[in-house]
């Protein structure tokens, strides 16, 4: 649903700005930490695949060309690194739609905040998390439970992407079964 109502002027992503005390981790360490935690949120390596001719609901497929460095960006705001400058940057980041040809998330590591602080700007499409109960990458990264730092990301191999024919066959099966699912959800009325 959130994909269907999104357009250029109405992005459907959820944004978050988190500010941290102290110096930031190195960009390389941060990327390695995110990569090591991606197995906990497999959706973050998947992209949306649309059924040909829009005959069915979009499906999630592993992104065979996943590049973590596309999703984790690093930037700095100009001195003095005020909250207003951070808000302006976040506004520019949030104003841009996510690329639907890739997994629908971005993390921006922001350096240069006043008082030696740094920030993380997170942007995730609403179809991936609901903002309340959905597990997202930021939740995993900011877990308060002590754990050893990840050493390296486990090897990952994307699943084979379904063919157009497979997607159309699944859409046809859903169309046949869907009336039964709709009826099953109706209330029983006794006269």
Language model regions located:
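Soluble acyl-CoA-dependent acyltransferase catalytic core bearing the H(X)4D motif
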Residues: 6-11, 15-191
């Amino acid at each position: 649903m959130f994909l269907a109502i999104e357009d250029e002027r109405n992005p459907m992503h959820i944004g978050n700005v988190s500010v941290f005390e102290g110096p930031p981790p190195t960009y390389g360490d941060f990327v390695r930490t995110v990569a090591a935690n991606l197995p906990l949120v497999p959706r973050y390596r998947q992209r949306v695949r649309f059924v040909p001719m829009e005959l069915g609901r979009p499906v999630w497929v592993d992104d065979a060309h996943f590049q973590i460095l596309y999703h984790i960006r690093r930037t700095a705001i100009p001195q003095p690194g005020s909250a207003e400058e951070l808000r302006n940057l976040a506004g520019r980041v949030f104003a841009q739609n996510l690329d639907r040809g890739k997994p629908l998330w971005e993390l921006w590591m922001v350096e240069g905040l006043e008082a030696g602080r740094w920030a993380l700007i997170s942007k995730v499409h609403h179809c991936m998390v609901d903002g309340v109960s959905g597990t997202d990458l930021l939740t995993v990264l900011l877990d308060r439970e002590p754990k050893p730092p990840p050493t390296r990301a486990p090897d990952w191999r994307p699943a084979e992407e379904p063919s157009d024919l497979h997607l159309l066959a699944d859409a046809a099966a859903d169309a046949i079964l869907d009336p039964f699912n709709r009826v099953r959800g109706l209330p029983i009325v006794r006269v």
